[in-house]
Amino acid sequence: MKYINQFMKISKGFLVPSSTIGLNSKTYHYKFPLLSFVREFSNGSYLRESAQNPANLGSQKGSDIFSMLANQKDDSNRQQKEERVKERPRSRISFKKQETMDPSYTLQSMVLRSSLKKVGALCRQIAHKPFYHALLQMKMSDKKISKYIATALVSARENAVREAGLDESTLYVDQIWVGKAKYLKKLITMGRGGRAIERSPRVRVTVVLRDERALLRDLQRRQQRLERKKVWTPLPNRPIYLKSNFFTC
């Protein structure tokens, strides 16, 4: 009886008096929203659980019934979504992700007392060059900061061979860039008792080394991209109709 009363409270907005169905000495008939609710409720697991545990039948609330129905819908939607994801074809791996899959070694140098412009020109000089060619360029350069960049290159080579297992004979500088470090500030005295703060720039150099394996994979990707490209076909030769004697856009 408790279960029937709770069911009546839940469905109060969906039932109207009639002589069709008798519940608790009152007659009601279904509206359309209640009909769908009864169908889902009769097919759910709530009735089976209540039949197994009749003692707990009157302890359930109306909100629990609706929440159980909502959970059943969520579970079915989740299963359908997982099936669609499994059937979906595997997406193509992006070029940036393929670069991270290749073996490489990254090293950041110590803080160097120089400006971004001066070090940036030297880094552009050795970017995408073989390792020993880049090292020779830094050793033969007359710039003061070049010897510190050469030291960073040597340290990167030793760590790349020992830790990353790269081939020393086929190393090349894949990327090299400059980043700003914390500037040094100094209080200086100027004329007529004036003072100012002198800022000395400092930078860090980051170098990425790769070997021949990554270079061959890159060439293979480029070749595959050219092969997938649609072949260009010229337009057919056709006569010009309605030709005018003056220029038209």
Curated annotation (Swiss-Prot):
Name of the protein in question: Large ribosomal subunit protein uL22m
GO biological process, one term: mitochondrial translation
InterPro entries, A to Z: Ribosomal_uL22, Ribosomal_uL22_bac/org-type, Ribosomal_uL22_sf
Gene name for this UniProt entry: mrpl22
Keyword Iron: no
Primary localization class, coarse: mitochondrion
Record note on quaternary structure: Component of the mitochondrial large ribosomal subunit (mt-LSU). Mature yeast 74S mitochondrial ribosomes consist of a small (37S) and a large (54S) subunit. The 37S small subunit contains a 15S ribosomal RNA (15S mt-rRNA) and at least 32 different proteins. The 54S large subunit contains a 21S rRNA (21S mt-rRNA) and at least 45 different proteins. uL22m forms the wall of the exit tunnel.
Ranges annotated as biased composition (Basic and acidic residues): 72-98
The keyword Transcription is annotated on this UniProt entry: no
Pfam families xrefs: Ribosomal_L22
Family the UniProt entry places it in: Belongs to the universal ribosomal protein uL22 family.
Extent of the transit peptide: 1-22
GO-annotated cellular components: cytoplasm; mitochondrial large ribosomal subunit
Function statement: Component of the mitochondrial ribosome (mitoribosome), a dedicated translation machinery responsible for the synthesis of mitochondrial genome-encoded proteins, including at least some of the essential transmembrane subunits of the mitochondrial respiratory chain. The mitoribosomes are attached to the mitochondrial inner membrane and translation products are cotranslationally integrated into the membrane.
GO molecular function annotations of the record: structural constituent of ribosome
Subcellular location: Mitochondrion
Location of region: Disordered: 70-98
